[in-house]
């Protein structure tokens, strides 16, 4: 049984300090925030991939933006986390024994603000010296997650937000 547990453990890669940022660009304002509190697990046997991050983990350059983001838009007291559960659909084409850059397609469910959507995301896995780095850039429509922007600032915030992901995975926690 111990041998089985060790074998299963070795197939999972983890990060507790992954990076996710978002960007909203309009002609009136550029809004950016970063979150380094991203937890993720990659199962190298199946290609299953999970992410979880605290909404309050996003940091803004302006504290007032951070306050509005948490209280008015994402309602982080009511919806404290964003999560993704999915699978790398082209996992069988990834060779973990060979350093390189591998394009990946990820399919799964993205949940935030109390809503869940099916998403298809493209990304890259970088394999180097036994480490895996996952990277992706994709967009999210605020309306898909019923995130409402007050009319007063509607022109300041893009309806589509760019999300960037960068996670360095390791065997150990």
Predicted regions, residues:
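Bacterial Sec-dependent N-terminal signal peptides
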Residues: 1-13
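Low-complexity, acidic/polar, glycine-enriched regions of mature
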Residues: 10-173
């Amino acid at each position: 049984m111990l041998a089985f547990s060790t074998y299963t453990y070795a197939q999972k890669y983890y990060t507790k300090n992954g990076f996710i940022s978002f960007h909203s660009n309009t002609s009136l304002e550029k809004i950016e925030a970063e979150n380094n509190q991203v937890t993720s697990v990659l199962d190298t046997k199946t290609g299953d991939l999970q992410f979880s991050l605290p909404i309050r983990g996003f940091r803004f350059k302006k504290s007032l933006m951070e306050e509005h983001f948490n209280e008015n838009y994402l309602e982080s007291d009511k919806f404290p986390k964003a999560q993704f559960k999915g699978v790398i659909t082209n996992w069988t084409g990834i060779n973990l024994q060979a350093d390189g850059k591998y394009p990946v397609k990820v399919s799964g469910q993205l949940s935030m603000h109390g809503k869940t959507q099916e998403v298809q995301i493209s990304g890259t896995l970088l394999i180097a010296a036994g480490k895996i780095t996952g990277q992706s850039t994709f967009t999210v429509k605020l309306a898909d997650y019923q995130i409402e922007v007050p009319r007063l600032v509607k022109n300041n915030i893009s309806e589509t937000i760019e999300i960037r992901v960068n996670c360095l995975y390791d065997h150990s926690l």
